[in-house]
Amino acid sequence: MKFLDEAKVYIKSGDGGGGSVSFRREKFIEFGGPDGGDGGRGGDVWVEAVNGLNTLIDFRYQQHFKATIGTHGMGRNRTGANGSDVTLKVPVGTQIFEEDQETLICDLTVEGQRYCLAHGGNGGFGNAHFKTSTNQAPDWANPGLPGEEKTIWLHLKLIADAGLVGLPNAGKSTFLASVTRARPKIANYPFTTLHPNLGVATIDEREFILADIPGLIEGAHEGVGIGDRFLGHVERTRVLLHLISAQEEKVGKAYKTVKHELEAYGNELTDKAEIVALSQIDVLDDAELKKKTKELAKACGKTPFQISAVTGKGMTEVLRALRDIIVEANTEEKPAKVPKLRHRDMVVTDEGEDKGGDEGDDQP
């Protein structure tokens, strides 16, 4: 499946149906009173986070979403039917922005979380509403109110526990493939990975999600190479695993290059817990390995792990270190209170279903 992490979408909620002008007509009743019903409410446009999606590719082929209009009221005080809602299904981790791409509308981080992006127009009053003591036969009704329309942007930030960062060909995809069932493309040339990949790692019967993003190079924050646009997918992680290839001539410089790009990107990425590992050590002899490990330790200020996805050396130790940080972070974080029902704009339920919003607001 192709990966797409942003999409531009036009949405429009349904117009409200018009009220009816009608009078009671029965045998032997010459002057029946008004009995025009109200118009139905227009359908809403919702967005919902669902499980099983990790791309916005569907929105490349459909960018317009319109809810149906409410039907007009009818005689005998019959209210028109409400319009049908439209729901945009998006991956968990999707953020919705206004057209300016700066104003955040909502951030969907929980499966089943829903948000009303555009409210349907209220139906108009029928003439039965306008009967008074001085006007027993009103011959007018209200039209329905128009729905809302806007253009929005969808931005996906994948939900993962740990993120893999490093220069191109640092062994990130090989690491992911060796500890999870993910099958990213692996080849001996730069930028083999062109989009993020996710995998579930298991260590000591505990699972966590790993995210592998395309490699960073010097100047990525200025658009060099693939740039830093995919760094958003590790913003939500608990810890970063920084891999430096043992094949780099200057491993200390390689570490600092990526670190500088993380600082230039911002969004507190450099404040995250970090594990540093010298990868692909199977290509070095003992003397060279010792030399490069010492150089990398000096650059990062800590003793790096030594790993090889080919031989399996050091892999278990790194996974356990990642697990410990993730478990500690999850323990320290206060459990979020997920309400079963919130205001009309946002609804979250245990089953991921909308249990309804405000009632009694079908009229203007």
From Swiss-Prot:
Single GO cellular component term: cytoplasm
GO molecular function: GTP binding; GTPase activity; magnesium ion binding
Residue intervals of the Obg domain: 1-159
Gene3D superfamilies: GTP1/OBG domain, P-loop containing nucleotide triphosphate hydrolases
Record's keyword annotation contains Nucleotide-binding: yes
GO biological process: ribosome biogenesis
Family matches, as InterPro entries: G_OBG, GTP-bd, GTP-bd_Obg/CgtA, GTP1-OBG_CS, GTP1_OBG_dom, GTP1_OBG_dom_sf, OBG_GTPase, P-loop_NTPase
Positions with a binding annotation for GTP: 166-173, 191-195, 212-215, 279-282, 308-310
Cofactors, names only: Mg(2+)
UniProt EC number: 3.6.5.-
Subunit details: Monomer.
One Pfam family per UniProt: GTP1_OBG
Descriptive protein name: GTPase Obg
Keyword annotations from UniProtKB, A to Z: Cytoplasm, GTP-binding, Hydrolase, Magnesium, Metal-binding, Nucleotide-binding
Locations listed in the record: Cytoplasm
Function: An essential GTPase which binds GTP, GDP and possibly (p)ppGpp with moderate affinity, with high nucleotide exchange rates and a fairly low GTP hydrolysis rate. Plays a role in control of the cell cycle, stress response, ribosome biogenesis and in those bacteria that undergo differentiation, in morphogenesis control.
